[in-house]
Amino acid sequence: MNHRRLTDLTAVLAGTAVFFTILAAAGTKKAAQAVSGTVRTAAVVCTGAFCYDAPQTLSAADFCDFDGSGAVTQGAVIGFSQLVELSVDGLQEGAGKGVANYQVLESALSFVARFTQRERYADTLFRLTLPPGIYEMDGQGEPLHLYQNTWLSMEGVTLRKSDSDCSALLRNTPSGSAYAGYEANSNLVLTGGVWEVPLEHFDARSEEDRFSVLRFGHCRNVLLAGVTVSGCVNGHHLELCGVENCSVVDSTFHGYLDTEYHGKGDKKEAIQLDVVNNRWVAPGFPDFDDTITQDVLIYGCTFRNLCRGIGGHNAVYGRSYTNLAIQHNTFTHLSGEGVYALNYAHADLSHNQMKQVAGGVTLLALTDHPDDAYYAPAQGDLPAFDQLPVQSHLLSVTDNQIEVADGSEPAITISGGVYGDAQFADSYGGRTFWIEDVTLARNQVMSGHIVQSYVRD
């Protein structure tokens, strides 16, 4: 990121026009360009542009001490050759400004999308910086939308949900859109800031209140650094649904309200890794084509006063969440597990600290009631048992410190199982789902115990 500045660009957006003045490095040539469009009350000011003589990358190593050596994944690696710096004017602090603030920020993000959707800007990263402050946000049921090649910088900023609609604060796909594979808006960066959901706006007795806060689906290269998500209502603070190459570093997740939706105890993970299988698993993210989340790094994050920390409670027969690194995180005061996961493969869980949790690490190849968690493929036939790959294997759980609140519960559970439910009994009834190639080493279990079953080399 620290490279010679080859081009200076200044611009001001006001009303319906954007004027760019490009000053070449020698300072001898000037050009002006006007781009038509409506941006409501927003003002977007271009404060600089950088062109690099070699392709650049942005990754976790730019924001924390992760160096990538020996890691099962590097997470997000975002390449670019140009960086355009933009700032937003028009956000207002104080009560009653939520709708106006939403319009300002959504308009600014949409304006950036006019450029990022064009092929000529395919290798340009646009950094949109918000001024420090606490801003109410009311999308009247609609989230903000983050588009291709956009970096939202929020140091010193709190975006506070001021409505009681069960809607996310941010997502990467417009309502009504459909994508396959990892082809939705990608190369997305969030740095700094607080995304706040005031839990007092919602009713724990409600049978309807539930939503996730930050939602990403069908995409690749998502990077969060120094982000705080405060509060979630029977959903996920961060939902990764069919995401390839993601890094979440030095971020904080806290606050959870369990409502009566599906009854109390409907356990949810703060960071969910999921598969795009159906509209119940992945609402709002068609096409439902079993695009799975893989190559994820979660490093140096804090999880407190939650249900579960990281993982997921859905899986598809024959598909695995692969290349996952969960390292150097802290989990405290959880009513569920620090990590709860199905069908993980090539996963490294190391140097995490868990204290006052209901369970530490739970990695499963089959649950006790698989019909509640495992699905047939969205497309094609259910795989025959002898054609299934090993769904959970190459798991390393090392150098963790775990203190379970109730010492009678397991600190670490590594388990396969025997299928005994009804839905897929013809194909899988009585068959054993094994976990293979597990490494447990140097874990300090201060309370609780270790369970391994249906595990083999």
Task: Please place each PLM-identified region on the residue numbering.
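Short, T/G/N/S-enriched strand-turn elements that build extracellular solenoid repeat scaffolds
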Residues: E106-Y121, E136-Q148, Y179-Y182, H218, ...
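Right-handed parallel beta-helix/beta-spiral solenoid domain characteristic of secreted/periplasmic
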Residues: G48, D62-F66, E93-Q103, W151-F211, ...
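Right-handed parallel beta-helix
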Residues: E155-T158, E183-V197, R220-G231, E244-T259, ...
